[in-house]
């Protein structure tokens, strides 16, 4: 009985501490993307309820990856997972229909500004080419094996309180692929109110961020990992022949991520549900970061001022 009481008490403490997330609803899980940034950035995103987060502005680059990946998955996937327990029943297989539907979802949200409006229209031709590049490279690796897309994986280490949840882009019985699309860049034309778009070059080495995400899927699936970058012209494949993709290095990166989450969880538990105390424990947001704190919603700007006393530079 005592053990039961203790567990109940502990559960309540956890619930109280994590109530800083999702407008009081708490946190169901960590994800790679939620833990890959500084804690301050996590707080000013995930402390808001989901319906509020959905209204936050984000530019064409995030949309580009979804447009390409979702289209390719529907074109060549044999199974697509909707949730961790539910697969898609059936889906459109015709390229034009898939692409237009995906584009429609993106365009439901108004562009952030004129520059973004231009980019969202112009990116379409780049996305079509990028779909072709992606489809080909995935097919070359998967060959005739059954291809599973968006497979949900969860994992929890040591004394972690919350699981890490992720979705694997492409999975077969032997391999998995983490696919990174490099969206085109947009630049202002000198002395004019116009913009131009150009292909973003592919990296020559895999980035630590992307390797860490790959390491999580590797630890969950134990399959042969591939990290692939694509743009509208070409692709580059990193597999286990690459020094940084070897088992030891992936494990090292995975446990580094776990350590970071364990630290965050200790801080959260220590602050017992006080967001302002937690904010004082972590480094204030670096407002000059090239992209972390651009395009903030008014609610987020207000929260930053409340928690850290930082006023927005206009």
Where are the predicted features?
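Metal-dependent nuclease catalytic cores that hydrolyze phosphodiester bonds in DNA/RNA
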Residues: 1-167
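Metal-dependent nuclease catalytic regions and adjoining charged, substrate-binding loops involved
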Residues: 219-314
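Short, solvent-exposed loop/turn segments at secondary-structure junctions
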Residues: 154-156, 182-184, 231-235
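Conserved catalytic cores of phosphodiester-cleaving nucleases, focusing on short active-site segments
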Residues: 68, 164-200, 217
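Active-site metal-coordination segments of metallo-dependent hydrolases
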Residues: 59-62, 202-211
């Amino acid at each position: 009985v005592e053990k039961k009481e203790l567990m109940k008490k502990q559960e309540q403490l956890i619930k109280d501490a994590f109530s800083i997330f999702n407008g009081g609803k708490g946190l169901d899980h960590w994800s790679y993307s939620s833990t890959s940034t500084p804690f301050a950035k996590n707080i000013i995103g995930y402390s808001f309820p989901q319906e509020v987060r959905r209204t936050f502005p984000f530019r064409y680059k995030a949309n580009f990856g979804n447009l390409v990946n979702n289209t390719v998955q529907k074109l060549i996937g044999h199974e697509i997972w909707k949730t961790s327990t539910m697969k898609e029943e059936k889906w459109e297989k015709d390229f034009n229909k898939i692409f237009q539907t995906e584009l429609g979802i993106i365009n439901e949200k108004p562009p952030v500004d004129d520059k973004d409006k231009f980019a969202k229209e112009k990116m379409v031709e780049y996305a079509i080419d990028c779909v072709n590049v992606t489809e080909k490279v995935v097919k070359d690796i998967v060959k005739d094996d059954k291809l599973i897309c968006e497979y949900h994986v969860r994992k929890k280490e040591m004394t972690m309180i919350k699981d890490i949840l992720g979705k694997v882009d492409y999975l077969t019985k032997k391999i998995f692929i983490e696919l990174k699309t490099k969206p085109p860049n947009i630049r202002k034309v000198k002395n004019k109110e116009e913009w131009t778009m150009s292909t973003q070059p592919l990296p020559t080495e895999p980035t630590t961020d992307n390797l860490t995400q790959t390491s999580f899927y590797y630890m969950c699936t134990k399959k042969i990992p591939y990290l692939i970058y694509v743009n509208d012209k070409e692709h580059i494949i990193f597999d286990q022949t690459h020094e940084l993709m070897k088992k030891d290095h992936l494990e090292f990166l995975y446990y580094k991520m776990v350590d970071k989450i364990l630290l965050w969880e200790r801080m959260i538990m220590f602050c017992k549900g006080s967001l302002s105390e937690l904010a004082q424990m972590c480094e204030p947001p670096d407002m000059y970061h090239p992209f972390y704190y651009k395009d903030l919603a008014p609610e987020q700007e207000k929260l930053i001022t409340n928690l850290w006393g930082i006023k927005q530079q206009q």
